[in-house]
């Protein structure tokens, strides 16, 4: 069970996920979006998302991203589908399909998400950022010879990196090399706050620690791009 919200009258929205052992979906596997009405002392099913995923996988998906906004609209990912469920109107809509593990990046409070529009990182030239409170969307694109990927969020400011397509590669063990040539930091409205690039240098990896973005730099040596330090 996962608590979503409780108002001052004691009404509660919550999730039940895994094997369902009662109600009209008894015997099925999935996620129930439920409402408890304090006045009538009744539990009502708002929506049901059926899945063959095991409990641990559902838990992992919900812990990675699930968000209830101030208008009682709930967002979650299940089997690569981004669901938008209006708890008051009892309507479920799929906003995006085919998401893979790293396709979606969320801010710390999960109120803002960024989606890489191509499943294949080698082809991705567009990122869509969505403010889940206002519903506003911002799109960031790059040229045909470039690729972009999400880096993360500093508070509610979004960071993404741009790389030359010819330098993006995947090793035999599955590790993706994405040497970034330019970092973009934008606000919730898509306005550029800061950009970082240095001639002849690449950003090999990044890590966000609190309000600090740490970058490991690299340069081309003997035909290969290699790490040189921070």
Which ranges hold each PLM region?
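Generic structural motif
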Residues: 15, 31-33, 204-206
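Beta-strand-rich domains and repeat architectures in extracellular enzymes and scaffolds
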Residues: 3-18
């Amino acid at each position: 069970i996962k608590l979503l919200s409780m108002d001052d009258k004691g009404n509660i929205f919550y999730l039940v996920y895994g094997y369902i052992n009662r109600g009209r979906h008894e015997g099925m596997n999935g996620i129930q979006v439920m409402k408890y009405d304090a006045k009538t002392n009744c539990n009502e099913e708002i929506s049901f998302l059926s899945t063959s995923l095991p409990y641990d996988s559902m838990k992992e998906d919900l812990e990675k991203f699930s968000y209830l906004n101030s208008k009682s609209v709930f967002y979650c990912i299940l089997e690569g589908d981004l669901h938008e469920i209006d708890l008051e109107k009892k309507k479920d809509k799929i906003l995006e399909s085919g998401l893979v593990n790293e396709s979606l990046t969320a801010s710390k409070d999960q109120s803002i998400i960024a989606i890489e529009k191509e499943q294949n990182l080698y082809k991705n030239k567009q990122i869509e950022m969505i403010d889940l409170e206002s519903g506003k969307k911002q799109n960031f694109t790059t040229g045909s010879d470039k690729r972009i990927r999400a880096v993360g969020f500093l508070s509610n400011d979004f960071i993404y990196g741009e790389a030359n397509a010819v330098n993006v590669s995947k090793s035999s063990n599955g590790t993706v090399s994405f040497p970034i040539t330019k970092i973009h930091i934008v606000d919730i409205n898509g306005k550029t706050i800061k950009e970082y690039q240095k001639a002849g240098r690449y950003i090999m990896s990044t890590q966000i620690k609190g309000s600090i973005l740490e970058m490991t730099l690299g340069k081309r040596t003997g035909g290969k791009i290699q790490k040189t330090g921070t």
